[in-house]
Amino acid sequence: GLVGACSTGIGLAVPLIGMCVTELFGLDRAAWGFSLDLVVIFVVTATFATSVWFGLEKGIKRLSDWNVALAFALLFFIVLMGPTLFIVELGFEAVGHMLQNFLRMSTWADAAKTSSFVESWTVFYWAWWLALGPYMGMFICKISRGRTLRQMILGCIGYGTLGSVVFFAILGNYALYLELNGIYPVLETMNSAGPPSAIVGVLTTLPWPKLVLLLFTIVCLIFAATSYDSSSYTLAAAATDELPPTAHPARWHRVFWAFLLGLLPITLVYLGGLKPLQSAVTLVSVPLFAVIILLTLSLYKSLRADAPAPIRSAAAAD
């Protein structure tokens, strides 16, 4: 399940990175086609294989820290050079709208079948998160050693949510501003050429488009790599017999899983489109329902076993 979920993530990132490369170097996307996708997959796989070879501190952590700095520099540039007031105001409106309609949107099943959004996206993302759940839990526990459960939960939910809100608010609102003001036909480009072309088109409307696109390509490449170097690390740890809590899996084992994760996306990208990727995630997530239930029961038993016994007062004892 984890191999399928991670491979799908790489498969989703490859078309976007490939489109950025063709725009940067003036290549013909149609002429290069699948060959360019293979090159991108190889570069991404080689990057996170190198990262996982150096381990948590020297590889994964260092690469992640660099990329966070680059990503926030890119976001700050968009806010500064774009419609700053529009981005900020619409961002606050969007957060308020989500909070007001969270329950309704979370339980919307589209019983009247007015669109295919629920089947195409809501179920797809739920299945993807379910498939990634065991790996994320194992990896977060590994890097959170020494922290309390409260710190770990608040850190994952708080920082993860905040990062998503900031990215959607800045990049999404800037694209919406271009569409509403007739500066760039975002929707038309998405429908005719696909989301990667629309994203590249939006970025090229900024000042110094080549520099912005180069930075965005690097950020996408490293984000893809840092997402899956942790996957290969976790897979190697799970496949190692009797690995002590403070020990690390063998380097060759980590690199083996890294390159194995890079093989499946080749097939998915070759099939083309989002449908094969969505179908793959939905399929691999089904067996993990039972795994999630067992993990939940195991966590409950562990917490009960580790919880300190209640202290009875002298008055209560009498």
Regions found by a protein language model. Name each.
Residues G1-V3, L38-A46, L70-M81, A112-S120, ...:
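Select transmembrane alpha-helical segments in multipass membrane proteins
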Residues A13-D37, A71-F77, G137-R147, Q151-L162, ...:
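Helix-loop-helix connectors at the membrane interface of multi-pass transporters/channels
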Residues C6-F25, L38-V39, A73-A109, L171-L176, ...:
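Hydrophobic alpha-helical segments and their helix-loop junctions in multi-pass secondary transporters
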Residues A31-A49, W53, T122-A131, M152-G194, ...:
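Loop-to-transmembrane helix boundary motifs in multi-pass membrane proteins
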Residues G1-G4, T8, F54-M81, L90-Q100, ...:
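Membrane-interface loop-to-helix entry segments
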Residues M19-G26, V44-W66, G82, M136-L149, ...:
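Membrane-water interface regions at transmembrane-helix termini and the short interhelical loops
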Residues G1-P15, E23-V52, M81-T84, I218-Y228, ...:
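Helix-loop-helix module between adjacent transmembrane segments
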Residues Q100-S115, Y174-K210:
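Membrane-interface interhelical connector segments
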